[in-house]
Amino acid sequence: MALLERVGLANKADAFPSELSGGQQQRVAIARALAMQPKLMLFDEPTSALDPELVGEVLAVMRELAEDGMTMIVVTHEMEFAREVADTVVFMDAGVVVESGRPADVLGNPQHQRTKTFLTRLRSEHEHP
């Protein structure tokens, strides 16, 4: 129950998965993973299938995990989240590391054209959905 409290879902302890939103299901998955007391957590696009309103719920839990010192490897297109939470950002293309470094450097002043192109397209998509 403590782990459900940690992810803000103690009130849903008796709920079935079909009764939970996508964001709530993701937070339950995080609680289940935390039950194993991991030293490291892997997230592969944890918000990609969520409605935009629910993305914040999951990112808030992940932000709290980071603040508590959890080591996380996160594959994401949530660039602002990465900028705020990550110690290191790695940009990959076709399985190859193109650029890595501090978030401010990689996301704010990328050195490689492929990184620049990706970030420009991503910003354009967010501005003109």
Residue map of PLM features:
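ABC family nucleotide-binding domain
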Residues: 1-94, 98-103
